[in-house]
Regions:
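Hydrophobic/aromatic-rich core segments of domains that either
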Residues: 206-270
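Intrinsically disordered, low-complexity segments enriched in polar/charged residues with Gly/Pro
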Residues: 55-57, 182, 226-228
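Generic preference for flexible, low-structure residues
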Residues: 73-75, 115-119, 183, 187, ...
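Secondary-structure boundary elements
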Residues: 134-199, 210-212, 249, 258, ...
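N-terminal accessory/pre-domain segments preceding catalytic cores
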Residues: 1-158
């Protein structure tokens, strides 16, 4: 996973009639600027921009599997951590407070040992910021085709709600559910927005990630939510989108299936 060295990438100049349209917003990208760094045992944790809702981690290559463990008193998240020189980006989606960030190395099977860790006090500049930047689960940069596609679809829209509606309808109509992939998807699978865009096929995780990429690229906070849908008790991925001061539930996979928001039980948010 590549990371950008620039925090904001400016878009093309707004058209002459921009006063009638939604103003252009910068593309927010993560930066490992080296201002606040924790290092040890071959691990580097860059916490320079925790106020923006993310932390960046890299680790020297290891023959053993590596995990990033990011926790508060409220919840714990585990992520795969590729070894190498490039940073991986992880969200600080649990809000303000003390985070424990650890890199864990596999001992055997599901047993992991601490390789290095740090405690980081987080104060977000805005509570929606973790859902405006790319991270390991919702990855993109200025060269991602889905970002350009979102720009085209958002052209002429007069509000975030209009943009969200256009992007949602695009994902719903462009994507078809891949039952073969659903039956064989490996543990630890991560979506690829451009692969989903190119194939027009995917599982619920692909739908939700593609929509989140396109929305975040337009400066609209978007979550990928993973949990269960009742009454079927189906493990599923969907979205929540921040519009007009509140989080709005969206499910591009099920679309008009008859489910209500109250049917959805959240496990994890990215």
């Amino acid at each position: 996973m590549a990371s950008s060295n620039t925090q904001e990438t400016e878009r093309a100049a707004a058209p002459a009639n921009a006063d009638e349209q939604q103003p252009e917003k910068p593309l927010l990208l993560p930066e490992a600027s080296g201002i606040v760094v924790f290092e040890g045992e071959g691990v580097t944790i860059d916490a320079s921009h925790t106020d923006q809702g993310y932390v960046m981690i890299r680790c020297e290559p290891s023959e053993k599997r590596l995990k990033a463990r990011i926790a508060t008193d409220a919840q714990t998240y585990y992520y795969d951590l590729p070894g190498g020189e490039q940073y991986s980006v992880y969200p600080l989606q649990m809000g303000d407070g003390l985070y424990t960030v650890r890199v864990m190395e596999q001992v055997e099977n599901d047993l992991y040992a601490l390789r290095y860790g740090a405690e980081i006090q987080v104060k977000l500049a805005a509570e929606t910021l973790p859902f405006l930047y790319p991270n390991q689960y919702v990855w993109y940069d200025e060269n991602t085709r889905a970002v350009g596609q979102a720009d085209e679809l958002a052209s002429g829209a007069k509000s975030d709600r209009e943009i969200a509606r256009a992007l949602y309808r695009f994902v719903v109509t462009h994507m078809s559910y891949d039952t073969d992939k659903a039956a064989t998807v490996p543990n630890g699978y991560l979506p690829d927005a451009d692969a989903s865009l190119a194939s027009g096929k995917g599982i619920c995780f692909d739908y939700a990630e593609l929509l989140a990429v396109m929305l975040r690229a337009q400066g609209i906070p978007a979550q990928v939510v993973i949990g269960n849908v009742m009454p079927e008790n189906v493990y599923h991925a969907w979205n929540r989108v921040f519009l007009e001061g509140e989080w709005v539930w969206m499910d591009p996979t099920f679309d008009r299936s008859g489910h209500r928001e109250s049917d959805y039980i959240t496990d994890r948010i990215y």
